[in-house]
Design a protein with these regions (language model features):
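N-terminal active-site segment of His-dependent metallophosphoesterases
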Residues: 1-52, 62-71, 80, 141-143
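Short, conserved loop/helix-junction motifs that constitute active-site signature segments
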Residues: 47-51, 100-104, 122-123
Length: 166
């Protein structure tokens, strides 16, 4: 099972559209995961129309229209792994322990908010993934997103994709 992970698209404030390399990944993914801060409903409509399956949440910059359509936290069993998606996890210091306590029973937690890519494993095995932002690099050298796979109940092939400058 192929996964495409993104967050913090902030359209149209940070870019006019999603980057072409990211959009090219959408039809190849079995599941597209978006960890919030869409800002406009057009991006949600676009990904709902192009994705085989969309697992998504709203973020702190999303208005009432997006909050009405998306949960604060989403859960799914994907290929034998229990996934959670949330926008904000708090400060980097102590994140692993805090998330492991808040989300017991998960194998993978996808989050956003910081626009800073993150890939760590908490004590007890919870994998924490932040794909960064494909449209707003915020103190990072590149805009980013992640791809990954689930194979025989294992998360594999986690790759951070760095987008060329706009």
């Amino acid at each position: 099972m192929r996964l495409l992970l993104m967050s913090d698209t902030h359209l149209p404030k940070r870019a006019k559209a999603l980057p072409a390399p990211l959009l090219d990944e959408v039809p190849r993914a079995d599941v597209v995961i978006h960890a919030g801060d869409w800002v406009d409903t057009a991006t949600l409509d676009l990904l709902e129309g192009r994705s085989r399956r969309l697992l998504a949440v709203h973020g702190n910059n999303d208005g009432a229209d997006l909050r009405a359509r998306l949960p604060e936290v989403a859960y799914a069993d994907l290929g034998g792994l229990r996934f959670g998606v949330v926008h904000e996890t708090g400060p980097a210091q102590g994140r692993e322990a805090r998330c492991a306590a808040r989300f017991p029973g998960l194998d993978v937690l996808v989050f956003g908010h910081s626009h800073i890519p993150w890939d760590t494993t908490a004590p007890g095995g919870l994998r924490l993934l932040n794909p960064g932002s494909p449209t707003d690099r915020r103190r990072q050298p590149h805009c980013t997103y992640l791809t990954a796979a689930v194979d025989d109940g294992r998360l594999t092939d986690v790759v951070l994709h760095r987008l060329p400058p706009r």
